[in-house]
Design a protein with these regions (language model features):
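Short, Lys/Arg-enriched N-terminal segments with co-localized hydrophobic residues
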Residues: 2-10
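Positively charged, low-complexity intrinsically disordered leader regions
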Residues: 9-31
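Short, glycine/serine-rich, charged loops/turns that create anion-binding
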Residues: 20, 71, 108, 119, ...
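Acidic surface patches and DE-rich sequence motifs
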Residues: 31-32, 107
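Substrate-binding N-lobe of the ribokinase-like
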Residues: 33, 37-101
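Conserved phosphate-binding/catalytic loop of the ribokinase/pfkB sugar-kinase fold
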Residues: 66, 90-94, 104-141, 146
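Single conserved hydrophobic/aromatic residue that forms the stacking wall/gate
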Residues: 148-155
C-alpha cells in the first residue's frame, strides 16, 4: 500500500488589481446630454475590482497580498485592506497622481452608469510589476483585476 505524505502548502495569493474611490450618486434618472441633475444622496466607498477581490480572498482565509498603486488621496483604501487582513506592502503610493475613482449613478430602478478615472491604476510600470513578482513563486496564484491596465505592462 502506498503511503500518502501530506505536506504543508504555503501558497500565497497576489491580487494585482485596481484600487478606486467610488462616488455613488442616487439619482431619479441618468443625466442626459446638457442636463444638470441634483443627486438625492452621495456615498463614498472603497472600490476597485482588485480591492474587492483581495478583501474577499482574505476573508475566505487565503494569505492575500495586494499590489497596485494609489495617490495620497487614497490612503484610506490601504486601511480597508489591512482591516480585512490583506498585506499591502506591494501597493505603491504616488505623490503626484490621484487615486483611481468611479463616478456611479444609481437610478430608482437600481440600474447604474459608471464613469472610470484610472488615475494611479494607470501608472503601473513594468519595473513595478517585475519588482512585485520577485516576491512570489510559480506555485503562488495571481488573479489580475484591472479595468484600465494596459496589457503590455504585465505581458
Amino acid at each position: 500500500m502506498e503511503r500518502i505524505v501530506e505536506r504543508e502548502v504555503s501558497m500565497k495569493i497576489l491580487s494585482f488589481g485596481s484600487l478606486n474611490i467610488d462616488y455613488v450618486y442616487k439619482v431619479s434618472h441618468f443625466v442626459k446630454k446638457g442636463e444638470t441633475l441634483s443627486a438625492e444622496e452621495l456615498n463614498v466607498y472603497t472600490g476597485g475590482k482588485g480591492l474587492n477581490q483581495s478583501i474577499a480572498l482574505s476573508r475566505a482565509g487565503m494569505e492575500t497580498y495586494h499590489a497596485g498603486a494609489i495617490g495620497m488621496d487614497g490612503l484610506f483604501l490601504l486601511d480597508q485592506l489591512k482591516e480585512a487582513g490583506v498585506n499591502t506592502d506591494l501597493v505603491k503610493i504616488l505623490e503626484d497622481v490621484r487615486t483611481g475613482n468611479a463616478i456611479i449613478q444609481n437610478d430608482e430602478e437600481g440600474d447604474n452608469c459608471i464613469i472610470l478615472f484610472g488615475g494611479a491604476n494607470q501608472a503601473i510600470s513594468k519595473e513595478q510589476v517585475d519588482e512585485v513578482f520577485e516576491h512570489f513563486k510559480n506555485e503562488d496564484y495571481l488573479p489580475v483585476s484591472y479595468t484600465h491596465l494596459t496589457l503590455p505592462t504585465i505581458a
